[in-house]
Amino acid sequence: QPNPAVVERAYGLGADRLCARTAREFTQQTLRDWGLEALAFDVELVVSELVTNALRHAVPHLAAPRPIRLRLLRHAGHLVCAVHDPSDRPPVVNHEDELAESGRGLNLVEALAVAWGWSPLRTGKVVWAAFAVDSAAHR
């Protein structure tokens, strides 16, 4: 039975060059609908990084039309962004080269979210990031 205190939206994303932009637009509209515009910049950036990582590392050769699934959940003072992809490979944070121009997306996620992690699934994995929702930020 669904928990009425949990609000959720999900979107299936295609593995194409517009994937990250589509994810940001979906996130922006969802945050606007939920009255959480104050979180938009950080959340959109993190969603973009998680989706780009999934696209780059998990689905480069898949033929599935919607291999990436983005879920946004609001519950108990938190907003959680979760990206499901078909790969079972764990995400890797690159702490080696602080000046690298690429490969630093999870460092950004780590810096902006209050928590993040990943879980293996029967059909791949989910990588998630959580943000604190200020009670004044939502309706």
Kindly give the residue locations of the regions a language model identified:
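Conserved beta-strand-loop-beta-strand hairpin that lines the nucleotide-binding pocket
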Residues: Q1-A10, L55-R139
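STAS-typified acidic loop motif
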Residues: A10-T22
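Conserved short strand/loop->alpha-helix "switch" segment adjacent to the catalytic nucleotide/phosphoryl-transfer site
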Residues: R24-S48
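Histidine-centered phosphotransfer motif of kinases
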Residues: D42-P60
